[in-house]
Amino acid sequence: MATWKSSRVNRKYKTKYRIRSWREYERGLRGRGDVTIWLSQEAIAAWIPPNNGLRGGQRRYSNLAILTALTLRALFRLPLRQTEGFLDSLLRLMGLALKAPDHTTLSRRNQTVEVPSLTRVHDGPISLVVDSTGLKILGSGEWNVHKYKMSRKRRDWRKLHIGVDEEGFIVAARLTASSGDDASTLPDLLDQIEAPIRRFIADGAYDRRSIYDQVGAAGTEDVVIVIPPRRSAVSPRSTNGPWAQREAALQRIHKVGQREWQNESGYRQQARVENGFFRYKSVLGGGLKARSSIAQTREAMIGCRILNRMFELGRPESYAVVS
């Protein structure tokens, strides 16, 4: 049996990129800091919910008001009390006779607030790239662990699974326990996507026949599935349907090596989802502030919506630099 060829690339041979639309991108970067983008007129108009007609106490803040406050909290990485003070000062500066939700209300409503889905309208089939990353919820930072040799046992994480389209927008997301299996969450991600899938890209953690079958059912008739087979992979007995693409990839890798296969198959587009994780942790941090699993899920979904909104304001268009 042929051996697998190395896929490592020396850094000096990697393709370099430059931003083409720098003026538009710079305008979008400035827009991300515009507070009025996040405290919209729509939210202000619907700040106080209408009377529901039922007996008893009425809610003082609408779902959109709570969602706006929690968005500002995530965006500026604020504790709940500072979120209350920050939003209250914004409303005063804008000359609005509105009050910010207090921190106890935010904590309670964070358990029930409705976060809109990440669904985007697409004109046709999409290319989907999926992966997962860890978000810390308990434990010391990396520096304390390194300097003071602190135990890594008292640390806990949640796993954020996302799917991005060819433009880099997050179109599906789910938060699971750190022990959550990547492949088992795929059905939930696919259920969030309305458009058919023409190309599916994922890493070796998704190298299962069930994944090929699920993507085949959710995709177009000629859907292309790009998943690198495991190094221990062998030719399957049956290669019917989408599973046949795995056998073709396996044979091609044995022939030309993994690096060349990645170039030919478009697997390098997997970097889009990695870039999404980099953006999430750079903008929102690598952890979750909420303590309950329900609130943590809402916090992560709000974070994904923030990244999509930033992308709408402006994203870079780059081109390869030929040296």
Where on the chain are the PLM-derived regions?
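Basic, amphipathic alpha-helical segments enriched in Lys/Arg and hydrophobic/aromatic residues
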Residues: R60-L75, R259-S323
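Helix-centered, glycine/charged polyanion-binding patches within enzymatic domains
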Residues: A2-K14, R18, G204-K281, A290
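Charged, often Cys/His-bearing segments associated with DNA-binding zinc-finger transcription factors
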Residues: M1-R55, R60, T68, A97-L98, ...
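Short arginine-rich
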Residues: M94-A97, R309
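C-terminal substrate-recognition regions of SAM-dependent nucleic acid methyltransferases
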Residues: S21, R174, E274
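Polybasic low-complexity intrinsically disordered regions
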Residues: N51-L67, L75-R81, G85, S89, ...
